[in-house]
């Protein structure tokens, strides 16, 4: 994919995936990091922008890997614990990235790529609305190979 679409840009490669779209409203300060929580390994990319109050996080993409992420329900429950929220969030609706089933809400989309591998995308609504969040998610694809 050479073109990120109108008003967007490419997000690069992250732990075996290509981020094919980053909304124009997302800041240019980009940081990658890796961590582990409750036997799940995260490789993350964060986009920020400077404001008068300091740095503001606009977009986060996390690639999660762990045996406990066997199903979409496992991923949903894991993320609920990680983000300290209700696993039965009524704002989440079903959606798909290719053949992979996921859930999407106003500012977060996540899906199970394969057993043990999930993606979690969180967008600041001031930088990317729910439609752009869905576009970001749809543009995160495994690298060929």
Go through the PLM ranges and name each one.
Residues 1-5, 142-145:
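Soluble, non-membrane globular domain cores that form compact, hydrophobic packing
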Residues 2-108, 113-115:
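Short, solvent-exposed recognition patches
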Residues 120-145:
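Surface-exposed amphipathic alpha-helical segments
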